[in-house]
Design a protein with these regions (language model features):
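Non-catalytic pre-domain segments flanking phosphatase-related domains
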Residues: 1-28, 32-36, 79, 157-163
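Amphipathic coiled-coil/heptad-repeat helices and related helical stalk/stem segments
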Residues: 8-9, 48, 94, 149
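Active-site neighborhood of HAD-like aspartate-dependent phosphohydrolases
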Residues: 15-63
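Glycine-rich beta-strand-to-loop/alpha-helix junction loops that act as flexible
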Residues: 28, 66-69, 131
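A short acidic (Asp/Glu
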Residues: 36, 74-77, 120
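Flexible, glycine-rich phosphate/dinucleotide-binding loops
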Residues: 39-41, 72, 135
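Active-site phosphate-binding/coordination module
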Residues: 43-105, 112-115
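C-terminal cap/substrate-recognition subdomain and adjoining C-terminal extension
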Residues: 91-163
């Protein structure tokens, strides 16, 4: 990602962070947790979990982990503190349904490059995590890895808190 791309992503985060009701939906595998070869060893990045804890505590902000895995397994791998109760778990095909359920006015959708998320609505923000995958034809903004996702989530949390 070039410096200009990063500036553009940060401006997009500034815009969407002000939406009245935000849904942050992140793929677990490849979005929050790096692919280490063995899916049972996958753990969410610590900084991502911390940022999600902050977002979970904010009013009018819904956080969802998107995964085909069993919700109990994902919960164990997330490294979340007491805020686990507010975390939503949905399959990739159910993000739109959750958006409607919580009446979100904006969505940040973080997806791994090997996933093809459903198209977003105007004003939503797509972030694709390459994880050494190809960047050709991927939707939205592109970040290199799960550590970059952690930075994005920290920025969203900071902006939503107003600090």
């Amino acid at each position: 990602m070039t410096l200009d791309d990063l500036d553009e992503l940060w401006r997009a985060l500034d815009r969407i962070a002000t939406t009245p009701r935000l849904l942050v939906a992140c793929d677990f595998d490849g979005g929050l947790a790096p692919d280490l070869g063995d899916p049972d060893d996958a753990r969410a990045e610590q900084l991502s979990s911390e940022a999600l804890n902050i977002l979970l505590a904010l009013r009018d902000t819904t956080v969802a982990v998107v995964s085909r895995r069993d919700p109990e397994q994902v919960a164990q791998l997330m490294r979340l503190s007491g805020a686990k109760g507010g975390l939503r778990h949905v399959g990739p095909q159910h993000v739109d349904g959750l958006r409607d359920e919580v009446d979100a006015t904006g969505v940040i959708r973080v997806s791994a490059v090997d996933e093809r998320p459903q198209p977003l609505r105007p004003g939503d923000l797509a972030i694709t995590v390459l994880n050494d995958g190809p960047a050709d034809g991927v939707p939205g903004y592109v970040v290199a890895d799960t550590e970059d996702v952690a930075e994005v989530l920290e920025e969203v949390a900071r902006l939503r808190r107003g600090t």
